[in-house]
């Protein structure tokens, strides 16, 4: 009964990213064929390699879809073998920020985040987060969507968000924190 209910909830998930409904989970340092690794930062909680409390995730893109692979640890639980919802929301927010950046060549701050939790995320269970830009309103507001799925392809959470582009001064400051080619995100000449 529980498995049937979970499948029904997964099928009812509204955010299907790209054309794939089932994701192959990849948990390594190299991108999946057709995907390119994006730069990362030193300080970010999600992708910062020098942040001792951070997740140290890497993001990859095909130029439209952005994805990352994550295996939550035991210390990420909020309640008995269930990863904290705030961490899941953080991951979905970050993937949408990157999706907006890849498409618009501008980073942004979250103005609104809506998360739908469909099923529990368990520690040590590999998951894939994917996101994409849905609309760009004259470079003043970006709308994106994201999903989190397990290795079996079941949707565990979906999200939508609205994002406000950062200022040029903030972007200039941000570039100094990047590791890798920031031109992939900010455009040539950065």
At which residue positions do the language-model features occur?
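HotDog/MaoC-like acyl-thioester-processing domains
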Residues: 3-9, 13-35, 121-123, 134-190
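A generic structural signal for short beta-strands and their flanking turns/coil linkers
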Residues: 40-41, 53-55, 64-66, 109-113, ...
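Catalytic strand-loop segment that frames the active site of acyl-thioester-processing enzymes
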Residues: 40-83
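Hydrophobic residues in beta-strands and at strand termini
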Residues: 70-72, 117, 165
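Active-site region of the double-stranded beta-helix
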Residues: 86
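Conserved active-site segments centered on acidic
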Residues: 92
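Hydrophobic beta-strand-centered segment that forms part of the acyl-chain substrate-binding groove
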Residues: 95-133, 141, 160
């Amino acid at each position: 009964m529980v498995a049937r209910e979970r499948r029904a909830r997964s099928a009812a998930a509204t955010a299907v990213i790209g054309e794939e409904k089932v994701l192959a989970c990849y948990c390594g340092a190299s991108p999946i064929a057709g995907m390119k690794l994006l730069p990362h930062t030193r300080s970010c909680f999600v992708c910062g390699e020098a942040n001792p409390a951070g997740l140290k995730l890497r993001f990859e893109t095909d130029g439209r879809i952005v994805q990352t692979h994550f295996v939550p640890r035991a210390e990420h639980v909020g309640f008995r073998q269930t990863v904290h919802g705030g961490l899941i929301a953080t991951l979905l927010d970050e993937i949408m920020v990157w999706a907006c950046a890849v498409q618009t060549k501008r980073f942004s701050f979250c103005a609104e985040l809506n998360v739908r939790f469909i099923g529990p995320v368990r520690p040590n269970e590999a998951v894939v987060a994917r996101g994409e830009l849905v609309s760009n309103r004259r470079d003043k507001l970006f709308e994106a969507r994201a999903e989190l799925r397990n290795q079996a392809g079941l949707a565990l959470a979906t999200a939508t968000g609205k994002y406000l582009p950062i200022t040029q001064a903030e972007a200039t400051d941000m570039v100094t924190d990047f590791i890798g080619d920031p031109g992939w995100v900010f455009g040539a000449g950065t």
